[in-house]
Amino acid sequence: MSTRAKVAVLRTKPESVLEDYRRLLKLADADRFLAPGKTTILKDNISWHYPMPSANTTPWQLEGTILGLHDLGYNDLSCVQNKTVVIDTYKGEDLNQYVPIFRKCGLPVLYNFKESDMKWVPFEPKVKMLALDRIYPKGLRIPDYFFGKNIVHLPTVKCHIYTTTTGAMKNAFGGLLSTHRHYTHTLIHETLVDLLAIQKEIHTGVFAVMDGTTVGDGQGPRTLKPVVKNVILASGDQVAIDAVSAKLMGFDPMGIKYIRLAHEAGLGVGDPKEIELAGDDVSGESWGFDVGWNFHRVMGWLSWYGPTRFLQKLLFHTPIVYFPIFVSETYHDRIRWPLKERKIYEQWKRDTAWGRLFTEYQQKGCLLI
């Protein structure tokens, strides 16, 4: 694309983070991208129901974004949650300290898996799909609640075993696709591009606010190595904010397939040379992150990309799917969390300023609302 995109980036600290988020939304021109007078959906990111640093939307990110939207006149807000076969949504919003914020500001919380909240309706995109029409040959269904509303994504800066990085574009995955979305993993990059095209059709505005106060290196989106980086980002260009995040982590954004494909499709700007950075200068930063390998990534590679991928339909489209779900749950929740990641979380709470702020949220619920 020839039009330059704008991504706002601010350095922050716990003492000022809520005010910094309010300033960030203004700096990123949120009111240019979100239609006035429309309900604005907040789509948080629960990659793991446990409060693993860098894996999930932070409570200060949620509270700061709500405050910033209120400042700009967006008072009709809601939150939409989704579930996966391995994540407990209710546990996640509780342990990650979202519930007190929802309650304090009277924010309606809806669940895309509850028929009383929304229904999955047939949808035929106007633009040609790269993958979803092949993955769902009987037709695509998306939640009816999403039509005609703004959406603000709340991802974090982190690596991902399937997509190298994950951020604004990947955050649409849980909201727009059903619990069968694991069918898309072989074509995950193309799927993310399709989802961005769909968002541009159904939403009155799309915006992203990304937390990089503690960022995630390694085998994300759950078993990460948290690193304190003290940055927050926002943009109305979902491709550009993911590109800036990827560059900060040390990756070539145009070398990441979903970013390159979206750039080439004209859905946003993925080339850092065509992105304007507003706020604090982070153009020289490169953190040298590396996704690396673990048991879960090896199993995922064999399932979706390796020589055994021909077994996909047997493994994931039949009741046999409950076995890999059990393996994943056992590995993450019964082995990794108690033996390793919980200790990392407790050390982060004890030894970092952001961990101590998280403790303050546990004690107070919210800070300014």
Summary of predicted features, one role per range:
Residues 1-369:
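N-terminal and secondary-structure boundary signal
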